[in-house]
Curated annotation (Swiss-Prot):
Record note on domains: The Mn regions are involved in microtubule-binding and stabilization at low temperature. They are required and sufficient for cilium targeting. The N-terminal region (residues 1-29) might play a role in centriole retention.
Composition bias type Polar residues, residue spans: 448-457
Localization per record: Cytoplasm, Cytoskeleton, Microtubule organizing center, Centrosome, Centriole; Cytoplasm, Cytoskeleton, Cilium basal body; Cytoplasm, Cytoskeleton, Cilium axoneme; Cytoplasm, Cytoskeleton, Microtubule organizing center, Centrosome
Species of provenance: Homo sapiens (Human)
Region (Mn 9), start-end ranges: 300-332
One Pfam family in the UniProt entry: SAXO1-2
Residue intervals passing through the bilayer: none
Region annotation (Mn 6) ranges: 200-232
Annotated stretches, region: Mn 12: 367-400, 401-434
Positions of region (Disordered): 446-474
Record-given protein name: Stabilizer of axonemal microtubules 1
Ranges for region Mn 4: 132-165
Length: 474
C-alpha cells in the first residue's frame, strides 16, 4: 500500500512538512533534490537533466610524501655568511678655542682706503667758434639736376569702342528652357452636395435624462469675532524684568589701549650699520650757465634756408648714366631660337569638342500640365451614406428593482466543511510509520476495521474542544 506524508494528507493547504536543505537524519553525500517544484511537477524519464559542470575529482595524489626541496635549494648550497663589520668612528671632542667668525672674503680681500672718483666729462671750450661751415655734400656735388626730354609711354592705344547696337545673342539656358505660359490647374475639391438628412441632431444624453437637480444648501460662512482691546494698561514688564532685578555695581572699566604706551617718549634711532660705515661725500655745487636774452632781428626775413643761401649750384654737366638703354622693338616677331625650339616644333592643334552624352529623354515641346498621378487617374465618387446600426432609444427606464439572483447564487452548491486530516495529531485511518531522512512524517493506511475505530476516535476528538492540532512550520 502507498504511504503518504503530511503534505499529501493536507487538503486545506496550511500543513506541510519542513523542506530542509540537507538531510539531518541521514549521513550521506547525495544531494537533496526535493523541492516544491519537484513535488508539483513530476519527473519525465524521456528528458534527462544536464550534467553538472563541476570538475570531477579524478586526480589522486601519490602516497609518497613530497620533498621539501626546490630548484634553488638543490642548485645553490648554503655558504658561511659573516656579519658586516661596521666602522667605528672616533668620539667627537669639542674644541675649546673660540670661533673667529671670519669668512674667506675677509681673509683674501684686504680693505683699502676709498676715495671719490671725479666724473669723466669732455673739456669745455671757453672760446666757441663763430665762423659758419661751408661744405657741399657728396650727393649734391655728383648728381646735379638737368633738363631731359620726357619719354613716350610704351602702352598700346585704346582703340576699342563698344557697339551701339543691342546684343541679340541667346544663351544655352534660354534655348533649352523657353518661357511658357501659365497652366490652368483643375481643382480636386469635391462639389458641394446637398444634405440628405435635414433632421436636427438630438442633444439628449443619458446624463441629462437621469440627472435630478437637488436644492443646494446655503454655504456656512464663519464670521470672525471682532477684536476687543484689553482694558488693563500695558506695564511693559516681562518675566525677565520681574524675576531679575538689576543691582548696583562698579562701573565697567575701559579695555581700550592707551594712545601712546609709556616708555616710548625717546626718539627713534634711524641709524643703521650701513649708514655708520658709509657716510655721504660733500657734493660740489652744480655749475649752471645763465641763459642769453633773446634779441629779435630788425631786418626782414628772407625765407631762405641755410642750404639755399650758402650752397649754390655750380656750372656742370649732368652725370652720364652707365645703365644701357632699353632696346624696344615695336614691330616684328621675336625670332630667337634655342635648342628646345629647334627640336620641338610647334604643330597645329585642333580644339577637341566636349563629349556630351546622347540625350535619352525627348523633352516635350508642350507646356507642363502640372498633373500628378493621383490627379490623372483619380475618379471622384459620390459619398455613400452608411446605414446606422445603433438601436433606437426606447425612452427612459422605469424604477424596476434589480433581480437579486446572480450566476453565482444559481450555480453555487454548498458543500460540507470537512476537517483536514493533517490537523489531527494522529490522522484517522493512518498509522505513523517513520520519519525519513528529509524530516517527512510518513503515515501508512490501516485496514477497514482499523479505519472504523479511528473514525470513532476522530469523532470523539472533534467533540473535545481542547484538542491540540498539529502545526508544522515551514
Amino acid at each position: 500500500m502507498k504511504t503518504k506524508c503530511i503534505c499529501e494528507l493536507c487538503s486545506c493547504g496550511r500543513h506541510h512538512c519542513p523542506h530542509l536543505p540537507t538531510k539531518i537524519y541521514d549521513k550521506t553525500e547525495k544531494p537533496c533534490l526535493l523541492s516544491e517544484y519537484t513535488e508539483n511537477y513530476p519527473f519525465y524519464h524521456s528528458y534527462l537533466p544536464r550534467e553538472s559542470f563541476k570538475p570531477r575529482r579524478e586526480y589522486q595524489k601519490g602516497p609518497i610524501p613530497m620533498e621539501g626541496l626546490t630548484t634553488s635549494r638543490r642548485d645553490f648550497g648554503p655558504h658561511k655568511v659573516a656579519p658586516v663589520k661596521v666602522h667605528q668612528y672616533d668620539q667627537f671632542v669639542p674644541s675649546e678655542e673660540n670661533m673667529d667668525l671670519l669668512t674667506t672674503y675677509k681673509k683674501d680681500y684686504n680693505p683699502y682706503p676709498v676715495c671719490r672718483v671725479d666724473p669723466i666729462k669732455p673739456r669745455d671750450s671757453k672760446y666757441p667758434c663763430s665762423d659758419k661751415m661751408e661744405c657741399l655734400p657728396t650727393y649734391k656735388a655728383d648728381y646735379l639736376p638737368w633738363n631731359q626730354p620726357r619719354r613716350e609711354p610704351l602702352r598700346l592705344e585704346h582703340k576699342y569702342q563698344p557697339a551701339s547696337v543691342r546684343f541679340d545673342n541667346r544663351t544655352t539656358h534660354q534655348d533649352d528652357y523657353p518661357i511658357k505660359g501659365l497652366v490652368k490647374t483643375i481643382s480636386c475639391k469635391p462639389l458641394a452636395m446637398p444634405k440628405l438628412c435635414n433632421i436636427p441632431l438630438e442633444d439628449v444624453t443619458n446624463y441629462k435624462m437621469s440627472y435630478v437637480a437637488h436644492p443646494v444648501e446655503k454655504r456656512f460662512v464663519h464670521e470672525a469675532e471682532k477684536f476687543r482691546p484689553c482694558e488693563i494698561p500695558f506695564e511693559s514688564l516681562t518675566t525677565q524684568k520681574q524675576s531679575y532685578r538689576g543691582l548696583m555695581g562698579e562701573p565697567a572699566k575701559s579695555l581700550k589701549p592707551l594712545a601712546r604706551p609709556p616708555g616710548l617718549d625717546m626718539p627713534f634711532c634711524n641709524t643703521t650699520e650701513f649708514r655708520d660705515k658709509y657716510q655721504a661725500w660733500p657734493m660740489p655745487r652744480m655749475f649752471s650757465k645763465a641763459p642769453i636774452t633773446y634779441v629779435p632781428p630788425e631786418d626782414r626775413m628772407d625765407l631762405l634756408t641755410t642750404v639755399q643761401a650758402h650752397y649754390t649750384c655750380p656750372k656742370g654737366a649732368p652725370a652720364q648714366s652707365c645703365r644701357p638703354a632699353l632696346q624696344i622693338k615695336k614691330c616684328g616677331r621675336f625670332e630667337g631660337s634655342s635648342t628646345t625650339k629647334d627640336d620641338y616644333k610647334q604643330w597645329s592643334s585642333m580644339r577637341t569638342e566636349p563629349v556630351k552624352p546622347v540625350p535619352q529623354l525627348d523633352l516635350p515641346t508642350e507646356p507642363l500640365d502640372c498633373l500628378t498621378t493621383t490627379r490623372a487617374h483619380y475618379v471622384p465618387h459620390l459619398p455613400i451614406n452608411t446605414k446606422s446600426c445603433k438601436p433606437h432609444w426606447s425612452g427612459p427606464r422605469g424604477n424596476v428593482p434589480v433581480e437579486s439572483q446572480t450566476t453565482y447564487t444559481i450555480s453555487f452548491t454548498p458543500k460540507e466543511m470537512g476537517r483536514c486530516l493533517a490537523s489531527y495529531p494522529e490522522p484517522p485511518g493512518y498509522t505513523f510509520e517513520e520519519v525519513d531522512a528529509l524530516g517527512h512524517r510518513i503515515y501508512k493506511p490501516v485496514s477497514q476495521a482499523g479505519s472504523q475505530q479511528s473514525s470513532h476516535l476522530s469523532v470523539d476528538d472533534s467533540e473535545n474542544p481542547n484538542q491540540r492540532e498539529l502545526e508544522v512550520l515551514a
